[in-house]
Amino acid sequence: MSTTSEAVQSKYSEAGVDIDKGNAFVEGIKDIVASTHKNGVIDNIGGFSAHIAIDVTKYPKPVIVNSTDGVGTKLAIAHMCNKHDTIGIDLVAMCVNDLIVGGATPLSFLDYFAVGKLDIEVATEVVKGIAEGCKQAGCSLVGGETAEMPGLYQGSDYDLAGFVTGIVDRDSIIDGSDVRSGNKIIGLASSGVHSNGYSLVRKICFDDNDYSVEDHIEELGSTLGEELLKPTRIYVQQVLNVIKNYPIHGMVHNTGGGFIDNIPRILPKGYKATLQAGSWDVPAIFTFLEEKGKVPREEMYRTFNMGVGLLVIVAEDKAEDILHHFEALGEKASIIGEIQKQTDENDERVTILPEG
């Protein structure tokens, strides 16, 4: 039997898939994965599925919430810098931030890692980042899939996808239905570009201007690679803390599409958002990209987060208290706009007033 098995493995290895290396990788990350587990996880790392016991007494009308996302071509920057220990944080952030804006608490996370040829060291660094992201979000990394696919991916090139499951009581879902005219919009600062718009970022920096990730950019105070690999901020714990204490009418994860495309996703029919430019700090990386790429400001607002990673819509009389609560939790926050009624159906859903 062993001789036959070895022969089969040899043929599979010749085809570019190393089962033994894959098994060694899974064995090597077990402690990393287990370090994220919280109460309720029934440990079975390497099994066929993951099991979580849920205390539904906390949720009279429990609703399971799911979200999935990736990190796009930010992966190319990780390869250029040969730095793979933070891209997993981005992966978790993109998923859990989408989940939290609906008021849900993240419970478990799964990842999908597809690669041409498995490099255990690189893959382990990626998983370390995913585990760190899960710890920041307070959810458990309960499993994943590592797929070695020669012919579809070249060499060490890899792609990532993440899947998060959360829970919320039906009566506590935040869906924008309570948004009204006069509500204030609080913006929570981003760490930089986060994980959207990197195809344009790479074109501006490396195709049109011939920069290297190793170039030190004075206005950024770092190398270009260091700036572009800053992990996406995870807002879960801060938001969960606030929604326990205050009513929140709506939230927006400011990702691809920026303010222009994302805010309308939470607005009831007949309402619009007006933002005031200058009411929040725009990180230097966006000015750099705008100038080097000659990108119109309107396109910047529709492509990047422009310094605001999450928007929180609240009643006017609660806005200052909620703002200060976020600040007490360590968030850099500011009131950046308000909700208004549309004057007619052709009225823009999002308007950004110029500074001054």
From Swiss-Prot:
Gene name in the database record: purM
Keywords, sorted A to Z: ATP-binding, Cytoplasm, Ligase, Nucleotide-binding, Purine biosynthesis
Pathway note: Purine metabolism; IMP biosynthesis via de novo pathway; 5-amino-1-(5-phospho-D-ribosyl)imidazole from N(2)-formyl-N(1)-(5-phospho-D-ribosyl)glycinamide: step 2/2
Keyword Iron: no
Lineage: superkingdom: Bacteria
Cytoplasm in keyword set: yes
A single cellular component GO annotation: cytosol
GO biological-process terms attached to the record: 'de novo' IMP biosynthetic process; adenine biosynthetic process
Organism: Desulfotalea psychrophila (strain LSv54 / DSM 12343)
Higher taxonomy: Bacteria, Pseudomonadati, Thermodesulfobacteriota, Desulfobulbia, Desulfobulbales
Disulfide bonds: none
Catalytic reactions of this protein: 2-formamido-N(1)-(5-O-phospho-beta-D-ribosyl)acetamidine + ATP = 5-amino-1-(5-phospho-beta-D-ribosyl)imidazole + ADP + phosphate + H(+)
Recorded family membership: Belongs to the AIR synthase family.
Name of the protein described by the UniProt record: Phosphoribosylformylglycinamidine cyclo-ligase
Broad enzyme group: ligase
Signal peptide from the UniProt entry: none
Location relative to the cell: Cytoplasm
InterPro entries found in the cross-reference section: PurM-like_C_dom, PurM-like_C_sf, PurM-like_N, PurM-like_N_sf, PurM_cligase
One of the record's GO molecular function terms: phosphoribosylamine-glycine ligase activity
EC number(s) per entry: 6.3.3.1
